[in-house]
């Protein structure tokens, strides 16, 4: 109804009397979804900024349309230097949803598990991959941390790998955590102490 072609996206939508709206040369209305974000990002971040992100479901059409209109409006080739799209967190393999009632907040998780356990659980999956949030995951991470703390020593500390390269590799936190697992396996087998002798 507001588009010339089905593939067009709406820049301005007419508003009904009870809906939010403003006077414009095109009649009373409001910005389309993509335009709202373009205007807010330009107002608060400028015409070009470093990082933009959101869920994987926003890549198309939302972010592509936001790029198209922002770049056209500002006569630029780029809106943001980096685009970061996160995977979804499910709960027991089901999409978290208020309507289903299966949302768990960080605060709720932190009431049951330490902040370190919650952080390790979140970092166990790369940010753009899905993560199934459940008690098994948190219990597993709690056991991992307990084991690491039990085995920790000055010898282990001197062998802890630098995480910088893995973080530069698209925030590859699972790769770094796997290196920590390998380190503590060596510690458990006595390989680290043998190196020091």
Which residues are covered by each model-predicted region?
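Extended alpha-helical coiled-coil "stalk/arm" regions
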Residues: 156-162
């Amino acid at each position: 109804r507001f588009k010339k072609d089905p593939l067009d996206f709406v820049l301005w939508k007419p508003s009904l009397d009870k809906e939010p709206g403003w006077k414009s040369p095109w009649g009373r209305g409001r910005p389309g979804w993509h335009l709202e974000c373009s205007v807010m990002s330009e107002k608060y971040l400028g015409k070009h900024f470093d990082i933009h992100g959101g869920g994987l479901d926003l890549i198309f059409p939302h972010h592509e349309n936001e790029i198209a209109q922002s770049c056209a409006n500002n006569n630029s080739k780029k809106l943001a230097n980096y685009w970061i799209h996160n995977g979804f967190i499910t709960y027991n393999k089901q999409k978290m949803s208020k309507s289903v009632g299966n949302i768990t907040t960080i605060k709720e998780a932190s009431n049951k598990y330490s902040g370190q356990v919650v952080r390790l659980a979140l970092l166990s999956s790369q940010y753009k991959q899905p993560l199934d949030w459940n008690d098994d995951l948190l219990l597993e991470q709690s056991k991992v941390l307990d084991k690491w703390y039990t085995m920790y020593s000055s010898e282990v500390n001197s062998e802890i790998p630098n995480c910088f390269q893995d973080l530069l590799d698209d925030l590859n936190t699972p790769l770094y955590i796997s290196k920590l697992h390998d380190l503590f396996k060596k510690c458990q087998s006595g390989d680290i102490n043998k190196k020091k002798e």
